[in-house]
Regions:
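Short hydrophobic core segments
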Residues: 5-7, 100-112, 130, 166, ...
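A Rossmann-like FAD-binding core segment of flavoenzymes
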Residues: 78-85, 181-290
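FAD-binding core/adjacent interface of flavoenzyme oxidoreductases
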Residues: 1-3, 76-162, 251, 262
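C-terminal, flexible cofactor-proximal segment of oxidoreductases
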Residues: 326, 330-424
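FAD-site-proximal beta/loop scaffold in flavoenzymes
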Residues: 123-157, 244, 254-326
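Rossmann-like dinucleotide-binding core of oxidoreductases
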Residues: 157-212, 216-223, 230-232, 320-361
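Beta1-alpha1 glycine-rich phosphate/pyrophosphate-binding loop at the start
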Residues: 1-77, 163, 173-211
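Alpha-helical membrane-anchoring segments
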Residues: 411-574, 588-593, 598, 603-615, ...
């Protein structure tokens, strides 16, 4: 049995584990190997989204994913432990709870904040590099406003309402932007004037986020200032106290009062990696040197990825950056190379990272980015930069936890966002009480039941009727179009070979053509059965004429009397099921979804009258949550969800919604 141990469940560790398990399974050696991933937490944290939790834009549960859920149904052992020591010569790892031997080691222990020896920085400042950090900082910010609202001492009150973020890189700017967006919400809640709150972003360099082009850095600075943030550049922090901060500005050292200081000035390798770096070849801040295949230059069975690796790609002057994209790329390369080393099949992959750009968000409504291909990059305006950020996150979630995390992410970021703190504002997050939809849901269901009953009365269970049904409708539309263009009615009717005598009779009374646009793949037709002066909603009809649908109807649905009868029975039974489901609030989502599909079928075959098109919009309106109030879904939904989540293949493919 070949043992592979992955240390660290960050971006690189989780992706490497998933990709390696998949590759070994495909190569048919999964039963001959054991992958173990070790982390001190039972969850994977989205470090790039911690500022959203710290400033209360999203709930704390949105930035973490349970490791057991991530690796459900896969041959991966999840171990909760803190690794203290790696014994490279013995191929062994020592943790607080046990020892673990390995044949191959993947070191992805991540990073931790670095304080550069600044006096008091570690003791008196808050950090933002873990789930716990974000929750603690969120509570601290809230407590400051709560205490300030009741504080009679002006000096103490000002101290509570003064926030410093040290570092104007990605984390610092995003934290300050999020906080600046959150402050007005807290001011309104605690009846505090916005001008009483002081926000300061400090950095020793001359511009924020210096890896951005200078033009975009300027935009970031202007955005922060517009949000009421004081941006203090070329200022080096020399000391941090319990309620003060000292900075060197030029040759002068100044002291400022500060109630909350957030340290985001830089990172270094985690303690485990730093200790390992003392035994094997490494570079600055505990990063371990690797070869082109991401193996330690001292031990070929030790792979180092993500923030822990030090590698300079051929033709480049600087080592790969400590960014998420590097973690993703290195995870893929390491997984491939370990699989090749184990199976002796395939080719080792040299690490050739291609970075597609950088972006920074200043709050939930504004972002800037520069992205594209390696040699062709462009600046993205705010909306598209924010869209790109969410799209990239979704791609990552698809890899890690599939549908369930994508759904959860969209819910947190778009559909339940409060105070319009989203790049689409609050347009998709306004909550309507579900009980208001009950009358609409019941009436929609009743109409479907009525339609089904009428079809039974008309004989849909007794004889083929679809040929007449479709033929009459087509003949009616064609006669109106023919009349508009001055074509003889007979010619129009001849064009519809399947039109029955009854259809031809209908076609004889032409109405008014209002719209006929042909887009090639489909044609939109809007007509009235009467002249406009005499028309009511019941006379106007709209149809999507889709050649593929027409072909399917002619060659499949109308192919035989037996097929017609089958389709008629299916349609009637579906209408009954939809109607009863909606009326009772049982399986409301699938009922409403099928309702939409049926309406589209009717729209593309016979067309819909305007007085019935309300059913389309009503079906959409009751899609989500309409059966959970005064409906059977209130009882059935939780029961089914509980048991559904325990099905093995459902857990493996993440086909559930938390």
């Amino acid at each position: 049995m070949t043992n592979i141990v992955v240390v660290g469940a960050g971006y690189a560790g989780v992706l490497a584990t998933k990709k390696l398990e998949k590759k070994l399974r495909k190569k048919g050696v999964a039963n001959e190997t054991q992958i173990t991933i070790i982390d001190k937490h039972p969850y994977h944290t989205m470090l790039t989204e911690l500022h959203e939790v710290a400033a209360c834009r999203v709930g704390e549960e949105s930035v973490k994913m349970n490791l057991d859920q991530i690796f459900a149904g896969r041959k991966v052992k999840v171990v909760l432990d803190t690794v203290n020591k790696i014994h490279f010569e013995e191929n062994k790892i020592t943790g607080e709870n046990g020892e673990y031997s390995y044949d191959y080691l993947v070191l992805a222990a991540g990073s931790k904040p670095t304080f550069y020896g600044v006096e008091g920085a570690e003791e008196h400042s808050y950090t933002l590099w873990s789930y716990d950090d974000a929750v603690i900082l969120r509570d601290r910010i809230h407590d400051c406003f709560r205490l300030a609202a009741d504080e009679p001492n002006a000096q103490k009150r000002q101290e509570l309402l003064t926030f410093y973020v040290i570092g104007a890189g990605f984390t610092g700017v995003e934290m300050m932007g999020e906080l600046a967006e959150y402050v007005p919400v807290l001011c309104e809640r605690f009846h505090i004037k916005r001008e009483d709150v002081k926000l300061v972003n400090v950095d020793g360099l001359s511009r924020p986020v210096p890896v951005l082009p200078e033009k975009l850095s300027g935009k970031v600075e202007r955005r922060l200032k517009k949000m009421g943030v004081e941006v203090l550049l070329n200022a080096n922090v020399v000391e941090v106290g319990e309620n003060f901060i000292k900075m060197k500005e030029g040759e002068e050292v100044k002291q400022y009062t500060a109630g909350t200081i957030v340290w985001t000035a830089g990172i270094e390798s985690a303690e485990l990696t730093a200790e390992a770096a003392k035994e094997i070849k490494s570079a600055g801040r505990g990063r371990i040197e690797v070869d082109a295949y991401l193996r330690s230059v001292d031990y070929e069975n030790v792979y180092v990825i993500g923030d822990n690796m030090f590698y300079t790609a051929p033709g480049e002057e600087n080592p790969v950056p400590q960014m998420v994209e590097n973690a993703e790329h290195s995870a893929d390369a390491a997984a491939n190379n370990i699989a090749v080393a184990i199976t002796k099949k395939g080719k080792l992959e040299e690490y050739a990272p291609k970075f597609h750009g950088i972006m920074v968000c200043v709050g939930g409504r504004w972002a800037t980015a520069r992205g594209g291909m390696a040699k062709h990059q462009m600046n993205l305006p705010s909306f598209f930069a924010m869209f790109a950020k969410h799209f990239i996150n979704i791609i990552y979630f698809i890899q890690v936890m599939g549908w369930t995390k994508v759904c959860s992410y969209l819910t947190h970021e778009i559909f339940t966002i409060r105070n319009r703190r989203s790049f689409v504002g609050g347009h998709f997050s306004n909550c309507t009480p579900s009980f208001l939809l009950v009358p609409l849901r019941v009436w929609l269901g009743a109409v479907w039941v009525f339609e089904a009953v009428m079809k039974i009365v008309e004989g849909w269970f007794q004889k083929p009727m679809l040929s007449e049904f479709f033929g009459g409708a087509n003949a009616w539309y064609n006669s109106i179009i023919a009349s508009y263009f001055g074509i003889a009615p007979a010619q129009s009717v001849d064009a519809v070979a399947s039109a029955t005598a009854a259809g031809a009779d209908v076609a004889a009374s032409a109405g008014t053509l209002l719209l006929d646009w042909d887009f090639g793949l489909f044609e939109t037709i809007f007509v009235s059965g009467k002249d406009l002066a005499s028309s009511t909603l019941a006379d106007y009809a709209f149809k999507l004429n889709i050649p593929f649908v027409n072909w399917s109807v002619d060659n499949m649905v109308l192919a035989s009397d037996g097929m017609q009868m089958f389709m008629q029975i299916v349609i009637v039974l579906l209408e009954l099921a939809i109607g009863l489901g909606l009326m009772g609030g049982l399986f409301t989502f699938p009922s409403a979804a099928v309702s939409v599909i049926l309406q589209f079928m009717f729209l593309s075959t016979t067309g819909l009258y305007l007085n019935g098109i309300w059913m389309v919009f009503a079906s959409v309106a009751v899609l989500i949550g309409a059966g959970r109030t005064i409906g059977l879904d209130y009882y059935v939904g939780p029961f089914l969800k509980k048991h559904w989540k325990n099905v093995k293949w459902v857990k493996r493919w993440y086909l559930y919604n938390d």
